[in-house]
Regions:
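The canonical Cys-X-X-Cys-His
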Residues: 204-216
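Intrinsically disordered, low-complexity regions enriched in Ser/Pro/Gly/Gln/His and often acidic
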Residues: 1-2, 222
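Extracytoplasmic c-type cytochrome modules immediately beyond a signal peptide or single-pass transmembrane anchor
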Residues: 27-203, 217-245
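Cleavable N-terminal signal peptides
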Residues: 15-16, 26
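Compositionally biased, intrinsically disordered low-complexity segments enriched
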Residues: 4-5, 199, 214
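Bacterial N-terminal signal peptides that target proteins for export
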Residues: 2-14
């Protein structure tokens, strides 16, 4: 696996010094773009993990070589490719401290999972993209005060249960009149404080159907009942609650 670079270590060092400063909310004016970038970082990290599923679940191997450093370096590299923002040079990226806090959360989640990732003799570890995203959201909230989660009508984990706002938006996403793939954003109040809420719809792809497809009610590899999804149907959304000034 590719090892993390010196520039990434420097960037994470900068992040460590500014994480405490990110108790301050995001300035109004660019908050929607910030939320979009946070969603992109989660999607990238989840994609990196998805590529590693066969490696992680190989019962014949012990050390898989899939580390937090590998995750963070891949996320930073792919984020630059998709957004033209280079988090290895944080002083030139607006809100770099916030983005780096999320990358650090992704790194930590992979590092914490090393004992199970590298345990031989097990063909399914349970460290799947949905679990990764949930743990990253929990870690990131502790660092930043920004809430991020996967949610959906057919949620499996209670932490992914949609709140009233999310349930309303999910119904809108499921309406055939809503443009497929179009996110939804609203400035509102949560607990008496101004926030930006963004939800980005996600649709069932081929890799989702092994656990969530047909036949409905059949047990999947995790022991849960399949939901009977079909490819292209609404699977859920990534939800962001971003505090504002």
């Amino acid at each position: 696996m590719k090892q993390t670079s010196l520039s990434w270590r420097m960037a994470t060092g900068v992040a460590a010094t500014v994480l405490a400063l990110y108790a301050s909310p995001v300035m109004a004016g660019n908050e929607a773009e910030v939320a979009e970038h946070l969603i992109e970082l989660v999607k990238i990290g989840r994609g990196v993990l998805s590529e590693q599923m066969k490696n992680i679940n190989d019962p014949a191997k012990a050390d898989k070589g899939f580390t937090g450093d590998y995750m963070s370096s891949q996320v930073v590299e792919r984020f630059k490719k998709s957004t033209k923002l280079d988090l290895r040079i944080p002083n030139v990226v607006p809100q770099a401290n916030l983005y780096l806090a999320l990358v650090q959360a992704e790194k930590e989640v992979v590092d914490e999972a090393q004992p199970i990732i590298n345990k031989p003799g097990i063909s399914f570890k349970g460290f799947i993209p949905a679990v990764f995203a949930r743990r990253v959201g929990e870690q990131f909230y502790k660092k930043s005060g920004v809430r991020m989660k996967l949610t959906g009508i057919d949620y499996r984990n209670a932490n992914n249960k949609p709140d009233d706002f999310e349930a309303e938006v999910l119904r809108m996403f499921n309406d055939p009149r809503h443009p497929k793939g179009q996110s939804y954003v609203r400035n509102t109040m949560v607990d008496g404080k101004p926030v930006l809420r963004m939800m980005d719809p996600e649709y069932a792809g081929p890799t989702c159907l092994g656990c969530h497809g047909s036949p409905k009610g059949e047990r999947d590899v995790t022991g849960m009942k399949k939901e009977g999804w079909k490819e292209g149907e609404l699977a859920g959304a990534i939800s962001v609650v971003l505090p504002l000034k």
